[in-house]
Structure formats: C-alpha cells, structure tokens
C-alpha cells in the first residue's frame, strides 16, 4: 500500500541539547526523518532548541522552530500553524529521544493533541505508556511468556522500604520516563536506598521508581526491531554488551552481532522481542529491547524497552547500513517494510534482515578529568560523553581500531607506561568497573592471571577475555621474534594493532615511521571492505567502507575506481567529548554537501556513530575509520590509487573537525598529503604564543601580558611580574583543558606540577587575567585577501569563564559602534597576519575601553552553527568553498554570503539570539554521593547548547533558560549570597526582583547590604555556621533542600570557608534542579528574562520567517 494520503503536515519534535544519555544520535535520526518526510511531499514543521544540529538548518523542514521543547512552546507552534491555515495533522515524537517522547505524552495528557486534532504517529499514546511505564511493561512481558527481574513500582519512600524488605539487598533503583539511566543505581545499604530512591522519585516525571532484584554480573544483550502496520517484523541487529549488567549500556563496550549467544538463546530472544513489540503496540516504527542472561544457569529475563529510536538504533544503523530512522519515518506515514527499498543494495526490500560478515565494536568516551572529585565508577547511571565505533573482520581487529579511535592519549594496549601493581591488585581493581577496565584486563592476563580468574573478577564473558589473552600471546611473539617477518607482521595487523603499538614492542624499527616503511617494503596494506547489509550476496551501490588487514595477501580492496571528479577528503571530529562536540560535525557535513554541489567528489573520514557525517549518503564516500595519522594516510593512498588517471585528490580538509584533524595536519603535509585552506604552518603560528605575539605587535593590537614557562621558578617570576590573578594553561588544547585561574603562588606550584605532565613538549602559558572584562567572540572568513565578519558575540558572563560554557548574545547588546569597528579592524589584521584561508575564530576581552586579543583559532569554532542560524549565513559552506579556491566576492555574487555588509553591520531591529550552555553536573557525584561543584571557570564543562531567539534580549534569554534548564521562576523566593566585590553590582538586579514580587533570602553580610539599600529580606545562616548565638535556625542549604527557594544567586568567594559554603549552596541547587547563577552578569540577564516572561509577550518564530526578516 502507498503512504497515507490523509497526512499532509507532520510536526517532528527533536531532542534538544546534547546531554549525557541523549546525544548526537538524535540529530542523525531527526535529520533522516525530516528528509524522508519532505521527499514524500509532506509539509514538515520541526521544533528543536539545539542550534548545533544539522536538522535545525532551515532547508531540512518547511518551518523550523528553534524554541524550547516544552509542552507550552510546542502548543504555541501547533496553534501558530493552525492560525496561519497550516493545520498540523500528525506528531512524530519517536525520533527525538526521551525529551520528545515525554513532551508528546504531556501534550496527549493535557488535551492539546485532541484540541488541535493532531494524531500521534510512530507510536501512539498507549504504546508509549505500555513501553515506558515499568509496571505495565512488566505485565506485558509476563503475558507473552517472558520473565522480568523481580520488582515493584513504588510511589513513596514507605513503599520503597517495604519492597527492599521483601527483595533483600542489594537492589537496583530505576526511575520511570528518564534517559541515560538518570537517577538509577545499585543500592547496597539502607542509606543507599534512601538517597537513591529520593533522587529517583525527584528525577522521574511520573514520580515513581522501580525497585528490582540485582542482576549485576549477568550478560546483557539488545535487539533492534522494526514493525509495520501489516505486522511485518524485522530484527535489524543483535548487540552484546562486553560489560556485564551493572554498567549502563551507554558506558559499556558493545559488540554487533552478539558473539556469545547460543542459537537457541538468540531464537528465544527474537521470539520474545517480536511478541513484546506486538503486545506493546508499536505498529509503525522501531524499538530497542534489552535482555539479560544469567551465565550460571541460562535464565533469560527482559530488562526494558524503548518504544522509539534510541542510542542503540543509531549504532545499529551505522553497524549494518540499515537506516532505522529513515525507515521508521516511512513506516510512520503508512508504508510497509516490503514497499521500502534498501538504499545500499537498491535491490532488496527493507523486510530483508541485514547480514553482517564483519564485527562492529563501540566504545564510550569519558570526561572524568573535567570533573575533579567525581566518582569514576561505572554504574547504571550513564556518564560517558561520546563514543567511537570501528569495524573489522574479527572482534580483536575491531577492538584495536576502536581503542585508538577514542583519542584518550593512549592508542591502545602498550602505548603508555604500565602501573606498578601485582596481579592480585589488578584483579581486585577489576571488581569495580571503571573506564580503564580494558587495559586492566590485558594487564592482569600479562601478569599471569588465567582467563577464568579475569572473567570471574570482571564479569566479562570468558570468550572476550580469551580474545584479549590471544593478543597477550601475540605480544610475546612480537617481542621474542629475532626478525619481524611478513607473516608475523600481517598477523599483528590482522589483530588490530597499529604501527605505533608494534613500534612500542620493536624499538629497533625507530618508531611508527619505521614500521610503516617495513610494511610498505613487505607489501602489507589494508584492504577496504564495503558495508553492504547482505554479506556480499548483492552488490552494494553505496560506497561505505572500513579497512581490514586480511591474512590472505591476495585479498582485494573494494574501493571502486572514481577518476571523473577531483576528490576532497574531509577529516571529521571523532568521538564527542567536552570541548569538541557536534558543532564541528555540523561544519564537516556542510563542507561535504556544498563541495559535492560544486563538482568535487567528497570523501568523509570519521569514527563517530552518532553523527550525520557518518550517514552513508552525506558524502560521496564514507570511511568509518580512526582519525589517526596511520589510518588517514592509508585512506589517502587508497583514494589516490582509485582516482588514477583522473584529477586525483585535490586536497584534505583539516580545518572543520576541531582539534583532532588539526593535530594531524603537519605530519600529513610532511608525508606529501595536500592540505587545503589555512596551511599547517599558519595553524602552528596561531598556536605558538611567541610567534602570534609578534603578529599582534606588528598590527599594534594589545594582548594581556603573558610569559612561557617550563619550570615552576619561571612561572613564579612571570606571575610576580604580571601580578595575580593569572590564567595558566598548556598550549595546544581544546575546551580549556587544564586551564585555571590562579590567585597565589602556592596554587601555581601545584598547577605547574600537573600541567607539565599534561603537555611535556609545550611550555605552560601564564597570562594576566583580566577581571570584570567583557568577553567577545568573533567568527570570520578570509579568502587570503578579503575578510567577512560572520558574527560578533558578546558573552554574558565575564572573561574567565570558558567561552563554551558562557551564554552569549548576537548581535552584541552593550557594545557600541566604535567597539564593533575596533573588533572588525583587529580581526582583519589577525586574519592577514596569520595567513588564514577559510574560517577564523578570535576571542577578545574589552576592559576600560581597551580591546585585548585573548586568542585566535584559524579553524571552524563551536559557535559556527549558532552564528549561521542567527544570521542566515552558511559560514561552513562558505569556508569549504573558499578553501578550494572561491573568493568572498564570488560567494557574495552567488548569494552564499550577503551581497553587502556582513555580521558586523546588523540592522538595529535585528532579532537577538542567545546561546546558552547545558551542563551535566547532576550526572556526577562524589564517591560519598555528594554533588560535584557547579561553579564555572576557564575549563569547559558543558556537553551541549541551546538557542533562544526573539525581538529583545530579555525574551531571548528567557527562552534560552527554559530550553536549557526548564525556565526561570516567575514567583517565589530568591536566595542571594555573594562575594564582597560583587555586592554593589547586585543591588539593582536584586531590587528589581523584589519589585517584581519575589521574596529575598540572604546570608548575614549580603542581607545587611541589601537592607541598607532598601531591599527587604529574610536571613539564613551559612552552612558551616552553627545555629544559636543570634544566628537564624535554618541554614541556606536547608532552605534550598526543603524546596523553599526558587532561584539561587551565589558568586564565589576566595579559597576560605565561604568558598566551601558556596560549594554546598550550589550543590544543593543542582540537586533540587533550580536555577543557580554564579556571576553578576548572569543575574542581570536572568532578571531581564524574568521580566520578559512576566510581560507574557514571548512568542514563537520559525527560522524561515526570521531569515526572511534579515533579508537572506
């Protein structure tokens, strides 16, 4: 049957900002859905608050609303479309993660969908409830003959205690309707139960938690299934978790297809999965079901299901080449599986289940170094911030590739010094899962532990441990062989070992370069295989490749000759991490699409399964490979060979994928690879403070005084000369890694000890820190002659808070025309001085009317997508064209850039866009269960961002806060406790809050100052003060935890007692999920946002409408 003809207009809800537990995989899913629906002739309206996504580009929907994803704002969008005669017929919420699903449930429950006659498609309200509600899902499992863990849904702490008494400790606590395992965990004691169930009841939208028997240590599996309205069901992929139950699947290494299932177990799982899917009632879309198997007796239970496209769906799509989100969207509008053609073979229908003749391994990327004090134990609450995926012809090859894809500083086994430990100590470590468990398993085996001992200690299946044991045996062979011959080297490469790993074992080969030279002499190169969904039964029409070192020297590569068009290789950004997220993938995708249109053949290299760039139809060719020098060079050789006789490889783009490809630029150029755009030498010049300082001196541009130090003595002398506070940081980092504001010599000494370990080959930078300065961010283009200012952003927080964590406004809200003109002149001088061809990001600080240059990055920045959305100018597309020879004048003529003016000449009535960072503090706790500090500083900690856009700053800021944190309060009590230096600045914002009807609560010193300024307030004591002696009975922390505070304003003190008090206050605010503002500027912005909300004139506006207003 063809698609439903009664559907003309579909609303798609995106997933909002990148969060731990809900990341870029939903940008990938939503982008696919929007493309499919529009291709089918449907009108598509999209709501998503995340400007960094491809799906919020205006060309992917007819009406794109970058607005908060709340029931209220979604209703405003539905109403606006209805008022304009564009009635929305259906809502597709299964492709936007838990955020979209929860919003759809709320819209259904509050009657909005019924009032506007909007149908839920993909999964209806009842199906969502049956799949998401723990008790209803458990009843369904029982009904179809399956078994669940013994459990009970509890709504109160009394019910929780009663259930724990029946089941016995330990138990697992799981809230309903949350994502990434938020609020869940293992409770070993009564105290654990009280704490975790309390958090769980607070974090569950339905205010209930599931208390279940512990199945920790069992083997975990997942099935990805799809069903159409004719009841056809396919199992797309089976996935096995390397780690046992107890580690969230998002934090586990996972393998596809499942490796250790017996055929009988798989068939049982498959039958159960299909029966559950039918009973839940997901009739037109995909779902993910998780199972656990007891390795001792084979008992199989069903854990849970997601009645939507999930994180695992993105992984399964990339692993198999079966586009789950795309097919789910087609099923939702009425197609059946047998009517949908497989994109890769162009012959088989989607009802053919994919067959894999390779192994896929996904590994998580963590960022514990960003959160000092956070407990790094892996639990049922997800903590990883990104992931990498690799494909190989066997498990151990894929494992080796994925380990070097993670970019943690270790390129797999044997590339870092071993810890000093005994075999018993390592085995004991393995009993507590951490992010270093793969290395611990290999080390324990190398120290003499048996496969059985390691499997028992770690809970990892003996089959996986045995695979790593085989690698340990191969290591011994590599160390002991008198000569490294072709047979042994080929075996090592077939086992996933990199040249760098082999070089670490054979010092006589003089490093990675020597190993590569030996391989070339022996004719050992990878062959590139194709992902074809059918184990080569049909020919693949889509070039989606992975490398493998086959044992058979005669094995042939499957890269088809392509000699017609010049090729451009685009290096992606690798796994998401704090400091390098999907903003960089966004730029890579734009480069691929625009260069294809301009007549180039685009080749994407990346290893991140969450992203749009690794979709098989984003670039003309995709290599799912690690972004290392060795792997990229082999792809370059393969592409050069496949293009023989034609124009060949025009160049490699390293400027768009963040620090990862930039770090490869110099070595690639030395190996003869043509780098397009800004040269590696110019990139190095901008990073080298001495050389960059010379550029600034020549241009007459001031910069904060600084010095370079390799010892503490040097750093001490520089700091004493410049004057404290100073900003210290290593060079060549992204996301402010290792950056600190230092107020005294003692702290400086501790920092230098750590920092020199962090980056031994580069000196530490010691800069004067400009307190109370306005920070300014600029994105610009340069074609070598002309400079085009893309956008000038004014940070809301003062300089000193990492730009990635600071909210910012575009156009600037307090800068004058002369300030903007100074910024333009400085940016032009830097672009020409460095030699930029492509994108440039410059950060400035404005203090006492002097514009200081903080740093310049000749690459795409994380603000490029935000600026592009706010100004209607596709900066990444323009950059890609410039790198391959187009001029700014030419791009103005073509309409890619504004015909006149640029981002520094915005109209006076232009709407204001505010970007706000989204921070993951609620995910991380200390080992004792305490919250980590939410104080911002020069090291980046945010995982994602949102955008608010409106006709004035207050309204735009209010939207950004609603999108990021669930809105600013409109009434209630505001608690204020600030450092002495901030008291004068905060009088007016707090006075305005009091005038708006808020009650004010403050600690003694702040209360006294507020009363002197005519602001009535109640007093509470500081957390570390005892009650009595004239002090109030309640402390600030007690008031917050009691739910009596709607917002906190707390600026940090020095390093004394009050600083500790500030930590407790901020931690309490995070745990109660209320706004916590830590800067004076943030407080002023919040007041403007609250005023705008209370006025009630905040509307919604599509990007298409906004861009037509801007004249683009």
Curated annotation (Swiss-Prot):
Its cofactor is Mg(2+); Mn(2+). Mg(2+) 2 binds at residues 304, 306. Pathway: Amino-acid biosynthesis; L-arginine biosynthesis; carbamoyl phosphate from bicarbonate: step 1/1; Pyrimidine metabolism; UMP biosynthesis via de novo pathway; (S)-dihydroorotate from bicarbonate: step 1/3. Residues 560-965 are annotated as: Carbamoyl phosphate synthetic domain. It is an enzyme of class 6 (ligase). Binds 4 Mg(2+) or Mn(2+) ions per subunit. The keyword Manganese applies. Its EC number is 6.3.4.16, 6.3.5.5. Residues 408-559 are annotated as: Oligomerization domain. Residues 966-1112 are annotated as: Allosteric domain. Mn(2+) 4 binds at residues 855, 857. This is Carbamoyl phosphate synthase large chain. It comes from Mycobacterium sp. (strain KMS). The lineage of its organism: Bacteria, Bacillati, Actinomycetota, Actinomycetes, Mycobacteriales.
